[in-house]
Amino acid sequence: MKTLYSLRRFYHVETLFNGTLALTGRDQETTGFAWWAGNARLINLSGKLLGAHVAHAGLIVFWAGAMNLFEVAHFVPEKPMYEQGLILLPHLATLGWGVGPGGEVIDTFPYFVSGVLHLISSAVLGFGGIYHALLGPETLEESFPFFGYVWKDRNKMTTILGIHLILLGIGAFLLVFKALYFGGIYDTWAPGGGDVRKITNLTLSPSILFGYLLKSPFGGEGWIVSVDDLEDIIGGHVWLGSICILGGIWHILTKPFAWARRALVWSGEAYLSYSLGALSVFGFIACCFVWFNNTAYPSEFYGPTGPEASQAQAFTFLVRDQRLGANVGSAQGPTGLGKYLMRSPTGEVIFGGETMRFWDLRAPWLEPLRGPNGLDLSRLKKDIQPWQERRSAEYMTHAPLGSLNSVGGVATEINAVNYVSPRSWLATSHFVLGFFLFVGHLWHAGRARAAAAGFEKGIDRDFEPVLSMTPLN
């Protein structure tokens, strides 16, 4: 494959480690791409492309650190996280840092440490990005063959894929180790309203874990989004981490099979399109996970899910009217169905009224009141605890509804509050980003397939607007 270096389009001669800041490799003459095409100019300059990626990582990590410290500086311990517009601290709290029983924040110092560590890391990445973008070798193949590559080199590409898979597997195991050995993680299902605990009894049964993948995505099934205990979540990360690491080793040691060499397009833009497609799928799955799952995304930090807020309202008024003497087991609503309680299509006792459509909700404040046939009437009469009442009243008034002007709550509610749930933000942003990543996947896949067939899709190079503009240099 070493012969491929001479086939590069727009390849130019360079002196290794040339200390100049010349604009070679960045203008249209030497790369075939105009300045606004961004990193396309660096397709065949592995050293410069490394600089762009490292600098980009630095920007990402800088944002994480700065935003983290910003949230710490504005944090008010007396209010729940989801009332304060926080999007990073809920993730740290979910990992068990700084919180105690009921999700109460008892120490903000770990959050401060996290922000500082990210800021320091971003400085290192930023320096590396600037070094490789401006001073380092333009191509890595000659001086550092291990880090060099040619996009057409199928064996090298699958080796790089393998390295990425191993890193992803290590990331999955970091969560496992945090949950098992380093202080545990927050469990919203811990008795009495949630607490941080170490996971001791991992679920490793493939029939249970892979059974989630075979579930229907609808209703009470809910595919993988229906997972509701941490043992399954952490056990799933053991499996995923192992599969990623073993798959990574396999991809490093093997060469692509003949069918894969024939079926796939082997170019930089093709790999970009594959990556965008995968990220798009991740975004859509994350959207559903954030919106519906209150185990991986505890309501104490992210606010209640939509179904949870609705069921909490039914529960709150059941408690109130029961105290006022209503017989909640037999009271009829305006439609002739039960006002407080009714039966689901499969016979369980569920909350009546409009919230009947959310009857498959599972939430830690409600489950203790269920029996073998749904909600247990005797428990509803005798066993409701003050913490359940407080939590449901809180969730009832913090439904994940809201608009861009930050007036949250039901649109017809005149006493709306200045609140938008982080659950809304996370779900919406991941859906929107997933959609745009999918469009990017289609665009780059089309261009890559066209290039492989010998022509080019996109803006006509002979008439693109940039040709009539003054060159940057």
From Swiss-Prot:
The chain crosses the membrane at residues 69-93, 134-155, 178-200, 255-275, 291-312, 447-471. The keyword Isomerase does not apply. [CaMn4O5] cluster binds at E367. Its main location: plastid. GO terms for cellular component: chloroplast thylakoid membrane; photosystem II. InterPro entries: PS_antenna-like (IPR000932), PS_II_antenna-like_sf (IPR036001), PSII_PsbC (IPR005869), PSII_PsbC_sf (IPR044900). One of its GO terms (molecular function) is metal ion binding. It is a multi-pass membrane protein. Residues 1-14 form a propeptide. One of its GO terms (biological process) is photosynthetic electron transport in photosystem II. The modification Phosphothreonine is found at T15. The modification N-acetylthreonine is found at T15. It is found in: Plastid, Chloroplast thylakoid membrane. Keywords: Acetylation, Chlorophyll, Chloroplast, Chromophore, Manganese, Membrane, Metal-binding, Phosphoprotein, Photosynthesis, Photosystem II, Plastid, Thylakoid, Transmembrane, Transmembrane helix. SUPFAM superfamilies: Photosystem II antenna protein-like (SSF161077). Binds multiple chlorophylls and provides some of the ligands for the Ca-4Mn-5O cluster of the oxygen-evolving complex. It may also provide a ligand for a Cl- that is required for oxygen evolution. PSII binds additional chlorophylls, carotenoids and specific lipids. Gene3D superfamilies: photosystem ii from thermosynechococcus elongatus. Belongs to the PsbB/PsbC family. PsbC subfamily. One of the components of the core complex of photosystem II (PSII). It binds chlorophyll and helps catalyze the primary light-induced photochemical processes of PSII. PSII is a light-driven water:plastoquinone oxidoreductase, using light energy to abstract electrons from H(2)O, generating O(2) and a proton gradient subsequently used for ATP formation. PSII is composed of 1 copy each of membrane proteins PsbA, PsbB, PsbC, PsbD, PsbE, PsbF, PsbH, PsbI, PsbJ, PsbK, PsbL, PsbM, PsbT, PsbX, PsbY, PsbZ, Psb30/Ycf12, at least 3 peripheral proteins of the oxygen-evolving complex and a large number of cofactors. It forms dimeric complexes. This is Photosystem II CP43 reaction center protein.
